[in-house]
């Protein structure tokens, strides 16, 4: 499964993920309207301005004229890492918005949240006690 994030600026999104240590895998179009970043075995697609959006229950278009771009923001994605605190330090150094600092949560996960410029949240975590 590969999540698709609807974004407002492809280059800003590539740059934001590169600050996290991810790499740009590919892009499509001139200028790009679709693309991907990857980290290890994980890949996330980007789509410019709502292509392939959900559309909701009101039979709104998912792409093109009449699409409700505001309804397409706010996706959360969980990303599992080896060291949450190292990722936190990298985010601080790169100026990435920290929405929630590294915290040991009652459900047994040390996690932090970072916010993408379009409002998507990456929930970065590791099971407490995992080696």
Tell where the protein language model's regions lie, with residue ranges.
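C-terminal catalytic core of tyrosine-transesterase DNA break-rejoin enzymes
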Residues: 118
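Alpha-helical macromolecular-interaction surfaces
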Residues: 11-12, 86
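Vicinal oxygen chelate
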Residues: 1-4, 19-115, 125-131
